[in-house]
Regions:
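Catalytic core of membrane glycerolipid acyltransferases/transacylases, capturing the structured
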Residues: 1-39, 46-47
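Non-catalytic C-terminal accessory region of glycerolipid acyltransferases
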Residues: 43-153
Length: 153
């Protein structure tokens, strides 16, 4: 859903288990590439960093998974790691309404919103504290976007 609303081609990391015959081809056509979860998938991480360094767009879900309730969860500790290695801007985004697909509605309303970019500091090292502050800022902006959608804005 996010990729169809973005003004540029978006690529995604998706769990390797989804890349079975036929379905895997569809995911690749939609811009996804596999990542082995629960470990350090160096090839997938390198692919993501290289994509960002070449000014491509990589969408990640900072919580590490989808929300079944529609509520915003806590960001995973490494949510900004690839962007920090590439010094790529972070564009907060939210998708609201996909949690109702399972309820049985035929055409649920889904909204996608993009926020203003967050940039890594140019004149200071990217420390754990900088990453934590940027992650907190990103999650706060996503929460604002989500609240705006839920309030009809």
């Amino acid at each position: 859903v996010l990729g169809t609303a973005a003004p540029r081609k978006v690529q995604f990391m998706a769990k390797a288990e989804l890349f079975v015959p036929v379905l895997g081809t569809i995911y690749r056509l939609l811009g996804a590439f596999p990542v082995r979860r629960g470990g350090n998938d160096k090839a997938a991480i390198k692919h993501g960093i290289d994509l960002l360094k070449s000014e491509g767009v990589l969408a990640i879900f900072p919580e590490g998974t989808r929300s079944r309730t529609g509520e915003l969860g806590k960001a995973a500790p490494g949510a900004l790691m690839m962007a920090s290695k590439a010094l790529a801007p972070i564009v907060p985004a939210c998708v609201v309404g996909t949690d109702v697909f399972r309820v049985g509605k035929i055409w649920p309303k889904v909204s996608v919103r993009f926020g203003k970019p967050i940039y890594f500091p140019k004149d200071e090292p990217i420390t754990k504290e900088v990453l934590k502050n940027m992650t907190d800022e990103m999650m706060a902006r996503i929460a604002e976007l989500q609240a705006g959608v839920k309030n009809g804005n």
